[in-house]
Amino acid sequence: MQDLPSSIADISDPELLGQWLEKYNEAYRAGKPMISDAHYDLLVERLREIAPDHGFLSAVEAETFADKREVRHPAPMLSTEKAYDKQSLERFVERVYKEAAQIGVTDVLFQVTPKLDGLAARDDGQILATRGNGYAGYDITNALEKGVIPQGGRGLGLGEIVAVQSYFQENLADRFEHPRNMVVGIISSDVLNISAKQALEDKQVHFVPYATLNKWEGSGKELLENSEKITQDLIQATDYPMDGMVASVMNQDVRDHMGATSHHYRWQIAIKAKGETGVTTVNAITWQVGRTGNVTPVLEVEPLKLSGATIRRVTAHNAGRIREKGAGVGASIEVIRSGEVIPKLENVLTPSDDTLIPENCPVCETPLEWNNDFLKCPNLNCKARVEQRIRHWFRILGNADWFGIKTVERLVAGGFDSLEKIYAMTEEDFLSLEFGPVQSKNLAEAINLSKSRPVEDWRFLAAFGISDLGEGDSRKILSFFPLEELLDKTRDDIVALHGFGDVTSISIEKGLKALGPTIRHMLDLGFNLQPTPLKSEMDVSSPISGKGVVFTGSMETGSRKDMEENARSLGANVQKAVTGKTDYLICGAKVGAKKTQKAQDLGVTVLTEQEYLQLVEGGESQSSPEQMSLF
């Protein structure tokens, strides 16, 4: 098949473009994307420009799964029309009101939900099936047996299979290029790699029904006036990978009147950000070593302007992309930048043979190892890894200023290459490294302040950078064991805890053993640690013990963070957003009725701040999803 022109604007052959889009779509559905979502969307829009009646644009983009039973859907699972700018959204709203007026409807209600970036599926309570071609999909019910969690329970209809975003970023981002790649692998393969197994053991891969998603509701006028704020609010409340928002008409009679094409429902549109792309040339490749040892490529390119900024460096994510796509010195590449996002390698237009992949670490010269598409330096004492570990400590601890990466690099170069050495430094030591008098004083004071300022013990533990002990899991594990006791626990002790699987337990035991002396040394320095409440000491008689609790709005009796910590001490499971596992939604000031709608739909008890305080202080809550005193 002939290659496409290097510039999207130069593509003029709709049949060739359609063939490439089919190829790109097939790779994407198989969990092995050849180009990014943004680049794919730009190509689809180009096809729409040059051949608006092309068959590809009217067909649902199908996925296939070998050896899976085909299942017909009771109603079509179609794709979604897309809006990349405010004008497209305005035209959609205008069209809706025009169609609604034809049947005498003037009060049209719109809903906006996150557009999850996963694998679309349908759960009827008996069978979990993929979207397929929109009319028939594939039976993947065994995904639930593998460990995929149905949020809100079974039988809630259409939804998306996704990995929890925060978990992916903390534990898997250095092993998979995108969460969707892992999800498709879990669904399509009977043999799972260790990382995918661990994600399933940790209950971090979910089937999320669209009905359980956070949502906004309002008029078309409110949607157009507040679309950016609506989007930001939903992004903050959603811990799943997303590639936009979906705006839908809620009035069933308007939906029925507007109907659908063979490709999408006319009463629904996806709101997506359109990244700006440009073409440049690779001048050099810089290899950077991270805290975990991953050696990642940064492309030094001919300067170009994108989204109002001059781009000189572009991330290429991993060495595998350099090797496979020929993104070496002299290559012509397409770069994309969306808003303030770091510019990324989008596509290699003219490959280069000059893709020399380093065999040794660029910092310590230790032979590198391949881990899937990633290069890794196995040397724990590599200078770059040491610098990044120390920087990670101060960044996560969050109570000591002045220790940026440049300062840390100077400390390590001067021989202060461990936390033990740095925390023994005096003002004179900083002066000896040619820091100025004022900066030396500030650094010495910052060291002392970091010991005396209050810090949560889970944050202290997470700052050591132990694999599989990020902030969330550190908080979780310290609710079972005090920090001092944890250091002596084995993998058997850890695997017995809820939420910790075999692979994670082995990794944590290994990390605690390796860093045990450092952790004990730092504990002996007398940090002002705030202990995590132990589950064994929690008041099981508390009315919120074991309950899922979400706080929203501005609280009067204290900060939301303080109220969340107090709820945890009473045994509650404090959550970020309302789901089917939420029991109570506690609303402070400035929370409108629309924000409580999801809780009502899911049968969650909605309480005002005062009603919540009465509840935990021994009173009985009289509120229910149907009876809310303030809304």
Swiss-Prot record:
Its cofactor is Mg(2+); Mn(2+). SMART domains: BRCT, LIGANc. SUPFAM superfamilies: BRCT domain, DNA ligase/mRNA capping enzyme, catalytic domain, Nucleic acid-binding proteins, RuvA domain 2-like. It is an enzyme of class 6 (ligase). It catalyses: NAD(+) + (deoxyribonucleotide)n-3'-hydroxyl + 5'-phospho-(deoxyribonucleotide)m = (deoxyribonucleotide)n+m + AMP + beta-nicotinamide D-nucleotide. NAD(+) binds at residues 37-41, 79-80, 131, 160, 272. GO terms for molecular function: DNA ligase (NAD+) activity; metal ion binding. Residues 539-630 form the BRCT domain. Its EC number is 6.5.1.2. The active site is at residue 115. GO terms for biological process: DNA repair; DNA replication. Keywords: DNA damage, DNA repair, DNA replication, Ligase, Magnesium, Manganese, Metal-binding, NAD, Zinc. It holds the Pfam family DNA_ligase_OB. InterPro entries: BRCT_dom, BRCT_dom_sf, DNA_ligase, DNAligase_adenylation, DNAligase_N, NA-bd_OB-fold, NAD_DNA_ligase_OB, RuvA_2-like. Zn(2+) binds at residues 361, 364, 377, 382. Belongs to the NAD-dependent DNA ligase family. LigA subfamily. DNA ligase that catalyzes the formation of phosphodiester linkages between 5'-phosphoryl and 3'-hydroxyl groups in double-stranded DNA using NAD as a coenzyme and as the energy source for the reaction. It is essential for DNA replication and repair of damaged DNA. This is DNA ligase. It comes from Desulfatibacillum aliphaticivorans. The lineage of its organism: Bacteria, Pseudomonadati, Thermodesulfobacteriota, Desulfobacteria, Desulfobacterales.
